[in-house]
Amino acid sequence: MTTILSVRVQGKVVIGGDGQATFGHTVMKSNVKKVRSIYKNQVIAGFAGGTADAFTLFELFEKKLEKYQGQLQRSAIELAKDWRTDRLLRKLEALLAVADKKNSLIITGTGDVIQPENDIIAIGSGGPYAQAAAYAYALVYNTNLKASNIVKKSLQIASNICIYTNQSFTIKEIKSEK
């Protein structure tokens, strides 16, 4: 379990995540890099779920981005189709949160590609806590915090509540057209 959060505000899109990997109720590693810059640093992506499964999906998604010349939505849809229909891929248990300068998406193993409302994505066990915090910072308080600070503060809140989330954060940022 983990917490991955993406926020798009003030001309930036940010994805951040914690670094904890667990096996059952045991922490196996505390510094897993679950957020990465991919496709010529034009796309950022984070994963929740099985680590090995997610790394496999990262590789497949990168191949789709190469094949479709960085078209995020098309690449996501093609990955979701493969993920849903391929016998081996269907067994992979992970979610991907991906973003480029125009779009933010969640890709699921059931073949769903979801574009979030309000450009906030939260996945993983601590996702609801981080999402609530991000909404509070971005919408309720109408803050002037940078996107990266909203993500960091929201992940800190989630890590204080969710036992499967730690404070070893990886945060990636790219420019947004929105």
Swiss-Prot record:
Its EC number(s): 3.4.25.2
Gene3D superfamilies linked to this entry: Glutamine Phosphoribosylpyrophosphate, subunit 1, domain 1
Active site per UniProt: 2
Top enzyme category: hydrolase
Main location: cytoplasm
Pfam families hit by this protein: Proteasome (PF00227)
GO annotation terms (biological process): proteolysis involved in protein catabolic process
Subcellular location(s) per record: Cytoplasm
InterPro entries noted in UniProt: ATP-dep_Prtase_HsIV_su, Ntn_hydrolases_N, Proteasome_sua/b, Proteasome_suB-type
Catalytic activity, as annotated: ATP-dependent cleavage of peptide bonds with broad specificity
Amino acids binding Na(+): 159, 162, 165
A GO CC annotation given for this chain: HslUV protease complex
PROSITE patterns: PROTEASOME_BETA_2
GO molecular function, one term: metal ion binding
Quaternary structure annotation from Swiss-Prot or TrEMBL: A double ring-shaped homohexamer of HslV is capped on each side by a ring-shaped HslU homohexamer. The assembly of the HslU/HslV complex is dependent on binding of ATP.
Functional description taken from the UniProt entry: Protease subunit of a proteasome-like degradation complex believed to be a general protein degrading machinery.
Family: Belongs to the peptidase T1B family. HslV subfamily.
NCBIfam families listed in its UniProt record: ATP_dep_HslV, PRK05456.1
Protein name: ATP-dependent protease subunit HslV
